[in-house]
Amino acid sequence: MPHQPPNSPLGAFLEALGEAQIKCILIGSMAAIRQGAPLMTVDYGFWVRLPERQYVKILAIVQKQGGTILARTLYELRDGTQVNAIFQPDGLDSFEIEFRRSPAGELEGQPVRILPLKRVIASKRAAGRDKDLAALPVLERTLRLAQRLKAPPPRRRKKERRLK
């Protein structure tokens, strides 16, 4: 994930979503990468809280910022960064529930919620696409390692303490 300057097109895009009061959650492989998964992807996937029929609001933001519309929900920002707007991801609860579950983070100087790795796994499993299924072993291993690192050290038994 390349570092971009503070006024990067991605930061400007996220800022414009915020100004338009369009909430979003970073999902998919990029959310997993932000949590330590050793994956590669070419786009940022954002679950947007917007009825799909109102996708033109996002198109307007992209065009105003000099971006290109590649498909109805896939955009290329002026520096080539690809953004995918997702309206109904597979395998997840409602936007409100997932938004509350998702910790606040920062992306290119802008606040953003990041879907927890466990939920990324659930979504990829439910989507069932070959590329998602292929990523599951890596994602599950990353989750196990992250949980192991967060776990408190095992308590020593009284007998072990006496031996010292």
Language model features with spans:
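Compositionally biased terminal segments of proteins
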Residues: 1-164
